[in-house]
UniProtKB/Swiss-Prot annotation:
GO biological process annotation, one example: translation
A GO cellular component annotation in the UniProt record: cytosolic small ribosomal subunit
Signal peptide (residue range): none
Family: Belongs to the universal ribosomal protein uS2 family.
Disulfide topology: none
Keyword Ribonucleoprotein applies: yes
Cross-referenced Pfam families: Ribosomal_S2 (PF00318)
Protein name: Small ribosomal subunit protein uS2
Record key words, sorted: Ribonucleoprotein, Ribosomal protein
UniProt superkingdom: Bacteria
Gene (UniProt): rpsB
Record InterPro entries: Ribosomal_uS2 (IPR001865), Ribosomal_uS2_bac/mit/plastid (IPR005706), Ribosomal_uS2_CS (IPR018130), Ribosomal_uS2_flav_dom_sf (IPR023591)
Record-linked SUPFAM superfamilies: Ribosomal protein S2 (SSF52313)
Any GO molecular function: structural constituent of ribosome
Protein's organism: Actinobacillus pleuropneumoniae serotype 5b (strain L20)
């Protein structure tokens, strides 16, 4: 069972919040105190919440659920992509485009265009058009890949989103709320937990903390996928 320990979180700096003057009072239940003008997150609250979230990610994944990892901060971007790829799920790590979930029909058309351009790079189309046109299409392809590359194979809305930084990704959370999609999110002391179904109080800036969240989430998803494969094999054997 995918789980994290108190020691893991301490070593990663999960307990370091933001400066006290930037706090959000709604995070008061999860704050232990302050040190040198910086809030300290109560890891005794975070630990059970995090492990509960991991168990639910495993359950969703075991039912073939799709998880969308969201983290567009510079500190999270590459790690978000790596974690999603590692557990064969989906990601948005560059910029959240308004309507990515709530206007899925339009997004689907952009994904189709992205895939069409990818095909053109392989089937010789670019050799038959002018250099200028080829350059324009290459730039369009790069732009679409940056925005939609992580969801181009998602084939429909996700069953949950896992967010690094509730404050930074508030638009994604609001869209998920509007559609009834469960939200798992790292919520720092300057953020609101509103709209987050599975709150994980913790530092959302430190690279080591971000890596811990993503490694644990990816492990939970892989565990769920593994149990699903085992169940299918048993059913086939019977």
């Amino acid at each position: 069972m995918a789980q994290v320990s108190m020691r893991d979180m301490l070593n990663a700096g999960v307990h370091y919040g933001h400066q006290t003057r930037y706090w959000n009072p709604k995070m008061k239940p999860f704050i232990f105190g302050a040190r040198n003008g910086v809030h300290v997150i109560n890891l005794e609250k975070t630990l059970p919440l995090f492990n509960e979230a991991l168990a639910e990610l495993t359950r969703i994944s075991s039912n073939n659920g799709k998880i969308l990892f969201v983290g567009t901060k510079r500190a999270a971007s590459e790690a978000v992509k790596a974690a999603a790829v590692d557990c064969q799920q989906f990601y948005v790590n560059h910029r959240w485009l308004g309507g990515m979930l709530t206007n899925w029909k339009t997004v689907r058309q952009s994904i189709k265009r992205l895939k069409d351009l990818e095909t053109q790079t392989q089937d010789g189309t670019f050799d038959k058009i002018t250099k200028k046109e080829a350059l324009m299409r290459t730039r369009e392809l790069e732009t679409l890949e940056l925005s939609l590359g992580g969801i181009k194979d998602m084939a429909g809305l996700p069953d949950a989103i896992f967010v690094i930084g509730a404050d930074h990704e508030h638009i994604a959370i609001k869209e998920a709320n509007n559609l009834g999609i469960p939200v798992f999110a790292i919520v720092d002391t300057n953020s609101t937990p509103d709209g987050v179904n599975y709150i994980i109080p913790g530092n959302d800036d430190a690279t080591r903390a971000i890596q811990l969240y993503l490694d644990a989430a990816a492990a939970a998803v892989k565990e769920g996928r593994g149990s699903n494969v085992e169940a299918e094999l048993e059913a086939t054997a019977e």
